[in-house]
Amino acid sequence: NMSSQMGHVGSPNRTVYCMTKHAIEGLTKAMAVELAPQRIRVNSVGPTFTDTPLVRRVIDTPQKRDFLMSKIPMGAMCRLEDVMAAAVYLASPAAAMVTGAHLLVDGGWTAQ
């Protein structure tokens, strides 16, 4: 499942978005337990703001970009490749015993 770092936090003016991401986390865990006997794994990936055309439009001023970057301890915007690597890992044999997990790809945003 594709979720977001916002599935682990709250944020002003983003109540509905955060609520839907929290719901994905609950769905992921419930499905993981339900499908585990069939050896079907269910996980989610939770990226931070990712460098895409949509996000570039949202952070369209230096002030907005600076604010966003101040929230990411690693000091870099998430790349699509970062999200893809997390999904590939979770789908790989290396994650054979990983189910019900939420893999954060947030540069430390939620660690604060």
What are these regions (language model features)?
Residues S4:
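Residue(s) in the substrate-gating loop at a strand-loop-helix junction
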Residues T20, T28:
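Active-site helix of classical SDR
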Residues E25, V42, P47-R57:
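Short, flexible catalytic-loop segment of classical short-chain dehydrogenase/reductase
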Residues V33-P37, A96:
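Alpha-helical segment proximal to the catalytic Tyr-Lys
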Residues V58-I72:
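A short C-terminal helix-loop "cap" of Rossmann-like NAD(P)-dependent dehydrogenase/epimerase domains
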Residues I72-V83, A94:
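A conserved structural motif in NAD(P)-dependent oxidoreductases
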